[in-house]
Amino acid sequence: MIAVINYGAGNLPNVVRALQRVGATLTVTDNPEVIRSAQAVVLPGVGATADTMASLRHLGIAEVLPAVIAASTPFLGICVGMQVLLSESEEFGLHSCLDIIPGTVRRLPEHAGKIPQIGWNQLQISPTFRNHPLFADIPDGADVYFVHSYYCAVADEAIIAARTDYGIPFPSVIIRDHLAAVQFHPEKSGDYGLRLLANFVRWSEAVQPKGV
């Protein structure tokens, strides 16, 4: 059972429908104990990191997620669900995040063009991750859909599985052990987005979490 975290994110229904379309067995929950015992966890998100962190803390989810990820529970963060994994965010002032992935959430550079980036852009998959299960049947250069003004400046470049250019080459996918996170919206990314979600479902089914 995949736990899809419900903390009020606007893209939650679309993420749920996309996961159901690829055959996922899931529950939508804001219960920390359900999240703790899940076979896999998906954290969707749109909006500001500070607001998201406030909701996660209020629900008691912020305290559970580090332990869930440390237990090797397969995890997928989407958009802001990726950004809150970092140490801190510069969005609307400096705010602390979950500090699971060392790094800072920073604004896209003004010379990139229109901010936020809204629309299709390419994944440049790192050769190191080319054969990772998450990228099965997804070619290098695949177009996926972005809506964001901030990006994840991660401290460890070895976890950057794919980059995308928008003024700068920013991490669009990170993978560390059984944690994956994407800056784009797979639920809006057509066939390639559905493939990534299907790949995550298969990947999560093959992993046995250690238990929290």
Curated annotation (Swiss-Prot):
The keyword Cell division does not apply. Its main location: cytoplasm. It is found in: Cytoplasm. InterPro entries: Class_I_gatase-like, GATASE, Imidazole-glycPsynth_HisH. It holds the Pfam family GATase. Its EC number is 4.3.2.10, 3.5.1.2. HAMAP family: HisH. This is Imidazole glycerol phosphate synthase subunit HisH. It comes from Chloroflexus aurantiacus (strain ATCC 29366 / DSM 635 / J-10-fl).
